[in-house]
C-alpha cells in the first residue's frame, strides 16, 4: 500500500495494491537509442491511480516457462485522481538478450501485459520544510522525477522551494525526457536542470550543462543539511557514491531518499 501527503490539489491519498491486472499498449516512441516510452491503458474497467514516484511490476514468463517480473517507475504527470480512461507511461531500457526486452520488443499496440501495483514510497512529502530539493538521477532513474513535476510546481508556487535536477548521461541523445525538463526549467525559475555528461558536453548545451558524473557536481551546489532534501535514483554505484557524499556535506540519512535501478535480463 502506498501512502503520501499532498497539498492543494494533492490530497492525502491511499493507493490500494491490486492483484494482477491487464494493461493494454496504446502508444510508444523511442526516447533514446536503447530506451522506449510506452503508454498503457488499464484494460479491466478499473482506474490505476498512483502517487508520483511509485512503480508497477510487470509479470511474465521466461523462455523456460518460469515466472518472473520487472519493476518500472511510472512516468505519467498528473495532478488528479486517475479515472478509468487515463493512461499510464513507463520508460523501458532494452538489454541485449534480456527476457523483458524480448517481451516489450514483441509487444504491439492493442496487446496486453500483466501487472501489479502501484508500489513504493519514493515520493514527495508535503510535510517537508526544506528550502531545496536535490533530485539526482541517471538513465531511466529520472522517470519518477518527470512524474513529480506537477507536484514540484505546486511546491515552488506555494512555499517557494527550489529544485535542482542533476541528470547523468553519456550523451545528449541519452537524456530521456529532456524536452520536458528543459521546458519545465524555462517556465519555472526555481527549477534548475543540470545535465551531466560523462563524455563531451554538446556544443549547443545550456549553461547549466556539466562534464563528469553527477556526484562530482555536488560540491558546486554546496548541499546543506539544514535546508536540503535529496532524492537519488538510478545506477546503484551512483546512488551509493552520492549518498556518501551527501552525508559528508551534512545531510542526515532521513533527508536522503534512495531508489536503486538494477539492470535485469
Stretches with model-predicted labels:
Residues 2-3, 8-10, 16-22, 163-265:
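Reductase modules of NAD(P)H-dependent flavoproteins
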Residues 3-109, 198:
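Ferredoxin-reductase
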Residues 118-128:
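A short, basic/flexible loop-to-alpha-helix module at the beginning of a structural domain
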Residues 126-131, 224-227:
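Short helix-loop-beta connector
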Residues 132-136, 231:
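Conserved beta-strand elements of the Class I
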Residues 138-143:
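Ser/Thr-glycine-rich phosphate-binding loops at phosphate-binding pockets of nucleotides
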Residues 144-156:
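Histidine-anchored nucleotide/phosphate-binding helix
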Amino acid at each position: 500500500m502506498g501512502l503520501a501527503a499532498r497539498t492543494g490539489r494533492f490530497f492525502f491519498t491511499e493507493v490500494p495494491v491490486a492483484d494482477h491486472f491487464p494493461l493494454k499498449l496504446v502508444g510508444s516512441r523511442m526516447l533514446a537509442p536503447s530506451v522506449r516510452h510506452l503508454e498503457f491503458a488499464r484494460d479491466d474497467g478499473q482506474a490505476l491511480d498512483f502517487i508520483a514516484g511509485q512503480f508497477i511490476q510487470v509479470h511474465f514468463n521466461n523462455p523456460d516457462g518460469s515466472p518472473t517480473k520487472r519493476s518500472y517507475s511510472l512516468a505519467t504527470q498528473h495532478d488528479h485522481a486517475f479515472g478509468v480512461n487515463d493512461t499510464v507511461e513507463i520508460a523501458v531500457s532494452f538489454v541485449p538478450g534480456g527476457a523483458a526486452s524480448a517481451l516489450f520488443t514483441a509487444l504491439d499496440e492493442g496487446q496486453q501485459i500483466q501487472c501489479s501495483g502501484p508500489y513504493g514510497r519514493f515520493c514527495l512529502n508535503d510535510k517537508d520544510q526544506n528550502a531545496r530539493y536535490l533530485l539526482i538521477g541517471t538513465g531511466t532513474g529520472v522517470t519518477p522525477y518527470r512524474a513529480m513535476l506537477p507536484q514540484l510546481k505546486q511546491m515552488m508556487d506555494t512555499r517557494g522551494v527550489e529544485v535542482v535536477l542533476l541528470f547523468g548521461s553519456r550523451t545528449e541523445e541519452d537524456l530521456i525526457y529532456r524536452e520536458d525538463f528543459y521546458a519545465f526549467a524555462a517556465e519555472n525559475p526555481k527549477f534548475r536542470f543540470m545535465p551531466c555528461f560523462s563524455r563531451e558536453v554538446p556544443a549547443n548545451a545550456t549553461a547549466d550543462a556539466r562534464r563528469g558524473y553527477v556526484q562530482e557536481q555536488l560540491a558546486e551546489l554546496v548541499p546543506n543539511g539544514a535546508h536540503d532534501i535529496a532524492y537519488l535514483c538510478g545506477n546503484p554505484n551512483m546512488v551509493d557514491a552520492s549518498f556518501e557524499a551527501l552525508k559528508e556535506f551534512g545531510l542526515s540519512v532521513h533527508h536522503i531518499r534512495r531508489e536503486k535501478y538494477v539492470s535485469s535480463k
